[in-house]
């Protein structure tokens, strides 16, 4: 047990010091002195999701929004879906909306012409509130045949109830909160990621088999930074770095009324939220602002690669004969080696898979 703990600690140090820290430094250097629009101009933006993918789609569209589904988790989910769902599944990336928090990311994924951050720090879509109870109204303002509900509620419905929703709605948003809930409550984030992937896969299989879904998207409001070990003092930045008229101060970000620059922080104007005179200030790399009681290793809100990049899984259910159709078949394997005789109770067999995954 002691050896296992030592191995876990060594792996954690290697990840933090050999990957997370240097990657954070390089990423911060890329963003420094620029806006997201200029620094990442060639990457699709989260706020354009509905306009680019949902509006104008002929097929009934299902959108699964998983709170804090990080890009790497979505990539693993995509690899699983390749072997379990016929059709075509592709995972690409989008640039999230800052600060990378749930109210902002969820609003950005809804239909809108303009996003607005209010003085109370709530986000409006064309003047409409975007909290959970109001998202269906925002969707219906763009497409009257829309529905929004929790993924868990949808999965617990009877087949007839799910079919009734599909008959009445052209656009269905399904919301999942597994990863973020575990992270915010100091739960096991790794286990939560596995649960989230399993639930999404089951939901997609259900949508395809029961409702003949031809177009499914899976995306997220934001990503996250996570390490197993609690934060140390060296992981924290002084609160004074968030200078100016501070409207909101959290461990990974602060919203200030003026765009101030400091070599120890990144400061981005909130242009996408209709507040170009305001700024989101975050410590460079993976540091956190000092805050009483702030020791949780799960974090989001900042501008790191892990927080800012959100996935977009696009699934198309192609039928046989259609372009892009991919049938699920069992792979052929052959036994390597000439020896076909088992001479004792301990032996090794080496197989070769003839087709690529």
Report residues per predicted region.
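Feature captures the catalytic ectodomains and active-site-proximal regions of enzymes
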Residues: 1-357
């Amino acid at each position: 047990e002691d050896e296992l703990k030592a191995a876990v600690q060594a792996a954690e140090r290697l990840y933090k010091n050999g990957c997370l820290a240097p990657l954070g430094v390089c990423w911060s250097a890329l963003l420094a002195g620029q806006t997201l629009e200029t620094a990442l101009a060639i990457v699709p933006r989260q706020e354009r999701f509905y306009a680019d993918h949902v509006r104008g789609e002929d097929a009934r569209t299902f959108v699964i929004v998983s709170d804090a589904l990080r890009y790497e988790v979505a990539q693993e989910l995509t690899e699983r879906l390749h072997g379990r769902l016929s059709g075509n599944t592709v995972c690409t990336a989008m640039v999230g909306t800052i600060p990378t928090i749930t109210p902002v990311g969820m609003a950005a994924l809804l239909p809108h012409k303009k996003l607005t951050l209010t003085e109370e720090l709530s986000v409006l879509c064309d003047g409409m509130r975007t909290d959970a109870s109001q998202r269906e109204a925002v969707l219906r303002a763009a497409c009257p045949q829309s529905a929004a509900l929790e993924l868990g509620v949808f999965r617990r419905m009877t087949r007839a109830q799910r079919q009734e929703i599909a008959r009445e709605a052209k656009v269905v948003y399904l919301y999942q909160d597994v990863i973020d809930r575990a992270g915010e409550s100091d739960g096991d984030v790794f286990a939560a990621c596995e649960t989230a992937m399993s639930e999404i896969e089951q939901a997609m299989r259900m949508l395809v088999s029961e409702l003949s879904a031809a177009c499914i998207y899976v995306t997220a409001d934001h990503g996250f930074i996570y390490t197993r070990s609690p934060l140390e003092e060296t992981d924290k930045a002084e609160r004074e770095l968030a200078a100016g008229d501070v409207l909101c101060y959290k461990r990974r970000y602060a919203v200030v009324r003026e765009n101030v620059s400091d070599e120890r922080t990144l400061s981005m104007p909130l242009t996408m939220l209709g507040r170009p005179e305001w700024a989101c200030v975050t410590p460079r790399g993976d540091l956190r602002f000092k805050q009483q009681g702030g020791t949780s290793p799960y974090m989001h809100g900042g501008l790191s690669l892990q927080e800012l990049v959100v996935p977009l899984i696009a699934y198309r259910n192609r039928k046989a004969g259609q372009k892009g159709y991919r049938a699920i078949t069992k792979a052929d394997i052959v036994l390597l080696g000439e020896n076909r005789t088992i001479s004792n109770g301990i032996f090794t067999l080496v197989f070769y898979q003839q087709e690529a995954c």
